[in-house]
């Protein structure tokens, strides 16, 4: 094991739940405003998960007041308090970029049984 792998191994988090594309998640993010710190929840559908190790990221998409909002998070970021999996989605793709063009009921993802 070389030095970079050792540093990566020590920075990995072990409290990350198993989730993938199509799952609806609540991401509790630490937000620092001045000297105050608070937790902000970002709820949406995971449209991709890519990378590996310390560089792994995932993108969450939600509709806010009719506008699509996407946010990309590093999985092992210290700014993420925790992640809750709300529902498991039944999808056949690893990247759900096609959801960007869909609106309303067409953008619904079937729930896994």
Curated annotation (Swiss-Prot):
GO terms for cellular component: cytosolic large ribosomal subunit. The keyword Zinc does not apply. One of its GO terms (molecular function) is structural constituent of ribosome. InterPro entries: Ribosomal_bL19 (IPR001857), Ribosomal_bL19_CS (IPR018257), Ribosomal_bL19_sf (IPR038657), Translation_prot_SH3-like_sf (IPR008991). The keyword Ribonucleoprotein applies. Keywords: Ribonucleoprotein, Ribosomal protein. It comes from the Bacteria. Gene3D superfamilies: 2.30.30.790. GO terms for biological process: translation. NCBIfam families: rplS_bact. Belongs to the bacterial ribosomal protein bL19 family. This protein is located at the 30S-50S ribosomal subunit interface and may play a role in the structure and function of the aminoacyl-tRNA binding site. This is Large ribosomal subunit protein bL19.
């Amino acid at each position: 094991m070389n030095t970079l792998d050792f540093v990566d191994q020590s920075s990995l988090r072990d409290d990350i739940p198993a989730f993938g594309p199509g799952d609806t998640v609540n991401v509790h993010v630490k937000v620092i405003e001045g000297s105050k710190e608070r937790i902000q929840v970002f709820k949406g559908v995971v449209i991709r998960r890519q990378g590996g190790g310390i560089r792994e990221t995932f993108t969450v998409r939600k509709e806010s007041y009719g506008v699509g909002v996407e946010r990309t998070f590093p999985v092992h970021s210290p700014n993420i308090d925790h992640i809750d999996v709300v529902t498991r989605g039944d999808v056949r793709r690893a990247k759900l970029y096609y959801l960007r063009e869909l609106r309303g009921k067409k953008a619904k993802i079937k729930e896994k049984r």
